[in-house]
Amino acid sequence: MNKRKILVPLGDKSYEVTLEAGILNNISEELLKIGITKNRKILVISNEEISNLYGEKFLNNLKDNKFQAKMVLIKAGESYKNLKTLSEIYDVAFEFGLDRNSIIIALGGGIVGDVSGFAAATWLRGIEYIQIPTTLLSMVDSSVGGKTGVNHPKGKNLIGAFNQPKAVFIDPETLKSLPKREFSAGMAEVIKYGVIRDKELFKYLEIEKNKNELINLKNEYLIKIINSSIKTKSHIVSQDEHENGVRAILNYGHSFGHVIENLCGYGKFLHGEAISIGMNIAGKIAIEKGLWSKEELERQKILLESYDLPTEIPKINKEDVLTILMGDKKVRDGKMRFILPKEIGAVDIYDDVEDSLFLKFFS
């Protein structure tokens, strides 16, 4: 049996991530197992692309099992992860009569999950929600850990809340319909876990046979890397739910990744692609500070590129880079903090990086 369960231990906010091929087809059964009783109202938040693939079957499964279910579709893309979209969800929630006993289900990628989680955190001061991620990036990263929110014109995820889901259900079968570029973008986050905490995962990803099986979307191989990634994230989140300390290492590559997304315009690079470039920049800074070797930087670069991820730094204005970085959530007391690698499998947080050390990488 290829069903995996991973506990995210957070006291009274603990929940399980269930990972199984085909679980989407038995969603009502899974909801009943975690205590979601029949006749409860369920608002499913998704987007048009995912709805066309799974929406009708998913809703019918819920309704056939006596759940009161309705679906609301939000527009795909980072530019729609905003307060206007949130307000549209509230309108539907009001019309549907979503009460405190109701539940929201996020069926989609990271944007759907982030917006749904924040809608759940704020509707009637908080109702339960469930994550059902359908992209690799959301499976291994954003669906676990409780970070929810929307963007503001001044920056990504500036409006949000920590809101842990009631459960997460992951079906690797949904990756079969994912565009190849989106799959590669998700691999950036998987490789990130290898660099920050799991050198065995990193080595596994370097093996040619594994690489081919992953690119060909073989469930057994997908389940292994998703399981490893979530275990790492779960362990870190359980130590530091609200990112006051060690959880910041999950942002390896993200500070510069957000700079690139912002300054190149949301949409030019997928999130995972920007993170890949950000990891390359962080790796270069680590060389400058004598933290790790050129060989390790090269291993990281080769691995990223082998999954069709970009590593080349785009041409952007140095002054703009500093402006965006100073608005980063990891800034403490006016000091920028960077996650830098010490070796494959270990990183640390540094607040003593001179501007000149990284600005030279931007033209």
Curated annotation (Swiss-Prot):
Annotated localization: Cytoplasm
Any single GO BP term: chorismate biosynthetic process
One function term, GO molecular function aspect: nucleotide binding
Reactions accelerated catalytically: 7-phospho-2-dehydro-3-deoxy-D-arabino-heptonate = 3-dehydroquinate + phosphate
UniProt main location, coarse: cytoplasm
Cofactor(s) needed: Co(2+); Zn(2+); NAD(+)
Signal sequence residues: none
Binding site for Zn(2+): E189, H254, H271
Metabolic or biological pathway, per its Swiss-Prot or TrEMBL entry: Metabolic intermediate biosynthesis; chorismate biosynthesis; chorismate from D-erythrose 4-phosphate and phosphoenolpyruvate: step 2/7
Classification via InterPro entries: Dehydroquinate_synthase, DHQ_synth_AroB, DHQ_synth_fam, DHQS/DOIS_N, DHQS_C
Domain of life: Bacteria
Stored NCBIfam families: aroB (TIGR01357)
Function: Catalyzes the conversion of 3-deoxy-D-arabino-heptulosonate 7-phosphate (DAHP) to dehydroquinate (DHQ).
Record-linked HAMAP family: DHQ_synthase
Name of this protein: 3-dehydroquinate synthase
Organism: Prochlorococcus marinus (strain MIT 9301)
Gene for this chain: aroB
